[in-house]
Amino acid sequence: MKFTNLTAKEFGAFTDSMPYSHFTQTVGHYELKLAEGYETHLVGIKNNNNEVIAACLLTAVPVMKVFKYFYSNRGPVIDYENQELVHFFFNELSKYVKKHRCLYLHIDPYLPYQYLNHDGEITGNAGNDWFFDKMSNLGFEHTGFHKGFDPVLQIRYHSVLDLKDKTADDIIKNMDGLRKRNTKKVKKNGVKVRYLSEEELPIFRSFMEDTSESKAFADRDDKFYYNRLKYYKERVLVPLAYINFDEYIKELNEERDILNKDLNKALKDIEKRPENKKAHNKRDNLQQQLDANEQKIEEGKRLQEEHGNELPISAGFFFINPFEVVYYAGGTSNAFRHFAGSYAVQWEMINYALNHGIDRYNFYGVSGKFTEDAEDAGVVKFKKGYNAEIIEYVGDFIKPINKPVYAAYTALKKVKDRIF
């Protein structure tokens, strides 16, 4: 085997064929980083048949003018069960970056550490404990099992729905009551989904602004989303949920006709048997449903007059690769949250994964705190409702390449942090 530079074609073909291949280890991300002006490297291992058996996208950033900080975002893509290959790769990678004036190397592999439920209870070990000792022996320092959302470090916990050998009906059956109701609600209430073009991205951004204001979280800027849509191409999808009022009002009218028919039947039952409590209760329940139905029809007609026949209500931003569909971000119009548009977006993309033979639907990051007062408690509850599981990853590893200078660099950084 040999450590070597890879072409974009070689890199892309290999990473597309592997499990635990993150969207930041794709040709789209490589082209994005080139366009942003980063120094980038595609490296990997080839076997004796000249076949790629490991690959990694690296970016390099200047440090202290003379040196560089090398980072592989969720890399490398490699068969982690082959410990000999892992050892060879990281050993050769260290030699490679040293030749390019590397001060230190930072990696955060897409490698599971353990599995949990959404209450934070450990349900299984991923069998990768050996990796920590291996990296230590290779000169890497583990930065710890951090929790929460960090502006620099990748999130260590993902909420993931396993789709392997499942049907859409299986997914619905495994949801909790609220998720089932809202998924069925959007299916019958005229909520449609289509995909936004680059020119329509401001619709998504407006929803993100609404959501970030109501939930008090910091969103990425416009450039982040536009650039990824541009360079990832078909590997990014932005589904939009919208109300088609013609269909919505038609369905409500059909529902009203059925309710009126049932109500008349209940009234006749009461005439025949005035003492029948069940008939009285049924009448009251049907009348409540009719009142709610009339309110929805009136609201639908009013909104149709104000906004036209189609009203955007929610949108999401998704990364796609053969390994997984990733729900990266999403937002909903605060004024029309009651239409449950986010459920239509999720259901559309779950079915996209099922229809394209993608076995993993990644709801993406959670803090890992699993408490009622955690900043993402509501999000965790939402994801839990789909019967997803939590995957905790091994975390971040740093290897000083030039040890004397790195020691001086970290000491200076600590002093600056104290001052500022």
Curated annotation (Swiss-Prot):
Q: What is its EC number?
A: 2.3.2.17
Output the SUPFAM superfamilies linked to this UniProt entry.
Acyl-CoA N-acyltransferases (Nat), tRNA-binding arm
Give GO MF terms, alphabetically.
Answer: aminoacyltransferase activity; nucleotide binding
- Aminoacyl-tRNA synthetase in keyword set: no
Q: Could you state one GO cellular component term attached to this entry?
A: cytoplasm
Pfam families (UniProt xref): FemAB
Q: What is this protein called?
A: Aminoacyltransferase FemA
Q: Which organism is it from?
A: Staphylococcus aureus (strain MRSA252)
Quick one: which gene encodes this?
femA
